Amino acid sequence: MIQMQTNLEVADNSGARRVMCIKVLGGAGRRYASVGDVIVVSVKEAIPRGRVKKGDVLRAVVVRVNQGMKRKDGSLIRFDKNAAVIVNKQSEPVGTRIFGPVPRELRAKNHMKIISLAPEVL
């Protein structure tokens, strides 16, 4: 679960390396975000000459969460670190590559572009 002040790694080549969640979108009092949810983030660490700079406020889609997710078949999937992909207002990725695996739950949330760019879908 991702909430305000949670630090996440960035799983794309947009130029950001680390971001912090400042808002969970989707409802007035929504507190937590999980895989596939859109959040508002602030860039805390970025590489030089990237598309985004430190201090930028952007949207991101959560692609990996540390807490385990239960699937309908009863299996549990969890990742080592929390990670997100920077997206624009139309929910299209800013970067051109995705690093690391992404869960297939993104397909149900209509993030097909992220699924197609990912090297592995679990």
Swiss-Prot record:
Assembly with partners or alone: Part of the 50S ribosomal subunit. Forms a cluster with proteins L3 and L19. In the 70S ribosome, L14 and L19 interact and together make contacts with the 16S rRNA in bridges B5 and B8.
Pfam families the UniProt entry points to: Ribosomal_L14
The UniProt record lists the keyword DNA-binding: no
BP terms from Gene Ontology: translation
InterPro entries, per database record: Ribosomal_uL14, Ribosomal_uL14_bac-type, Ribosomal_uL14_CS, Ribosomal_uL14_sf
Cited HAMAP family: Ribosomal_uL14
Taxonomic lineage from the root: Bacteria, Pseudomonadati, Pseudomonadota, Alphaproteobacteria, Caulobacterales
Keyword DNA-binding included in the entry's annotation: no
Annotated function: Binds to 23S rRNA. Forms part of two intersubunit bridges in the 70S ribosome.
Organism superkingdom: Bacteria
CDD domains (UniProt xref): Ribosomal_uL14
Cross-referenced PANTHER family: 50S/60S RIBOSOMAL PROTEIN L14/L23, LARGE RIBOSOMAL SUBUNIT PROTEIN UL14M
Alphabetical UniProt keywords: Ribonucleoprotein, Ribosomal protein, RNA-binding, rRNA-binding
GO molecular function: large ribosomal subunit rRNA binding; structural constituent of ribosome
Designated name of the protein: Large ribosomal subunit protein uL14
Family: Belongs to the universal ribosomal protein uL14 family.
NCBIfam families: rplN_bact
One GO cellular component term: cytosolic large ribosomal subunit
